[in-house]
Amino acid sequence: VDEEKIKNQRQRARKLGALKLDTLTKSISKPLRDVLKAYDYELAVLHPFEATLADLTVRARAKQGHQSLPEVLKAVNELRKSVLETGKRHAAAAKNATSKQEAIEATEAGFREVESLMLEGADVVLNLIDVQKALRKIPIVQLGMPTVVLVGAPNVGKSSIVRAISSGTPEVNNYPFTTRGMTLGHLQYEDWAEGQCQVMDTPGVLNRPDEERNEMESLTLASMLHLPTAVMFVLDLTGNSGALSSIENQIQIRNGLRARFPKRPWVDVISKADLPMDQEDPAVARAPAGALKVSVADGTGLADLEARVKEMLLDVREVLSAIGLAEGPGGRVEGEGSGG
């Protein structure tokens, strides 16, 4: 009788120990596995503009000394596999124990080792949480809404124009990878069935090759490439925007982007028209023909600009309707690839 009792106690201890360890490891590994699967899925189905923003955010974190997203996800997966392996090993030891006490000791040893792994891997989980927090901070842009993007070199007056032509007070979107906010306004047209459109300034673009561009410039190019946009290229010909925004640089930036995106609805705008141009700079003579002269300070040209913006947005809407994206999730304008 005593032997039978001892045998039953041993079997119960074996079974209970293996079950406890299995439950523990699954309670840890399954959520980690679900997170990894969710990242794989989301990264695969992200809109190209969202994917660019996510990539820029993670790249900026990496430059600050943080792990890249692939490194973070790899570390999480390694932690998950370690917990599973440890749990299975100790569960097998408990299941094959020759006594009740041995089964209990194997179970307790498994709990201690899993706990130790999780304590040592706390930074892995915290890194994942930090990445998620950074990605959640990315402002939301209406991906399928017709949009006018204001593009140009730094300090040429783009955000002032956004504020001047927006139907209401624009908001400032702050991205995790830049200290400069991006002003986002809306235009409301009562004679359109879906009358709201977006207008946003973008970070300044410098006169340099793509491989030398920073995250802010990449954001500007992504908005031109991946959103249903018309382009307002803003030039300041006063000569007061700084060396990086010299008139020569501005014109070269403009010509390069126009060649890259030849099918986009486009308007050239000379800002600060209330101030004299730098007539001593020979580059002024090469300013694009037909550019609208605008001054936010005294209202010069704003009515003409607003009319032109509406025309361009109508063109964008017609393209979206033709490809079935007028009310969908958005995408790039038909007929333009990465090279425009």
Whereabouts are the PLM-identified features?
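Switch I (effector-binding) loop of TRAFAC-class P-loop GTPase G-domains
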Residues: 141-143, 166-198, 206-219, 247
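Conserved P-loop NTPase architecture
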Residues: 1-147
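Conserved C-terminal guanine-recognition region of P-loop GTPase G domains, centered on the G4
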Residues: 217-290
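Amphipathic alpha-helical transducer elements in NTP-driven molecular machines
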Residues: 18, 22-25, 181, 214-221, ...
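Conserved, well-folded catalytic cores of nucleic-acid-processing
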Residues: 82, 86-93, 131-138, 164, ...
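Glycine-rich phosphate-binding P-loop
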Residues: 146-167, 180
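Active-site glycine-centered loops adjacent to acidic/histidine catalytic or metal-binding residues
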Residues: 201, 271, 295
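Canonical P-loop GTPase G-domain recognition
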Residues: 274-331
